[in-house]
Regions:
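Non-catalytic substrate-recognition and accessory regions of acyl/acetyltransferase enzymes
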Residues: 1-68, 75-97, 101-137
Length: 137
């Protein structure tokens, strides 16, 4: 109702729910622990601490239906990026952010997709990963 994000349902060819994801814009303040290279990737400037970034949140597959287990996480990311590219063509933007819990299966997945960890966080915080939109397509 507040229009901060949009959630998309991904339906397969048999009209089964295959997965879902949420897209939003997020204001980021990049602290001093973030390398200049990653700061430049996000904001375009190595000395600019504030930036807006696209956020892919709540990325998930439907494991409840055995008929859609073939649907990959890579496919969900690609569909989300297609929507982000449409927004980028209209309003601009440089990078995409994902946040995840510190579980190896999640961190390995995002690193496999080309995301880089933005900064090390405490063990109870979400990990933050970014990727340049140029690297996604």
């Amino acid at each position: 109702k507040k229009h901060f994000s949009r959630t998309y349902l991904v339906i397969d060819e048999h009209q089964n729910l295959a997965g879902y994801f949420t897209l939003a814009l997020k204001a980021m303040n990049l602290d001093k622990r973030v390398s200049n290279r990653l700061r430049k990737l996000v904001s375009g400037y190595s000395n600019k601490p504030d930036s807006a970034i696209y956020l892919i949140g709540q990325l998930g597959k439907n494991y409840a239906n055995p008929n859609v287990k073939q649907f990959s996480g890579d496919s969900l990311i690609n569909i989300a990026v297609d929507y982000i590219n449409e927004a980028q063509n209209i309003v601009g933007g440089r990078a995409v952010l994902v946040e995840c819990e510190n579980h190896k299966i999640l961190t390995d997945f995002y690193e496999h997709c080309g995301f880089q960890q933005l900064s090390k966080q405490s063990s109870d915080a979400l990990l933050t990963y970014v990727i340049s939109l140029d690297k996604l397509h």
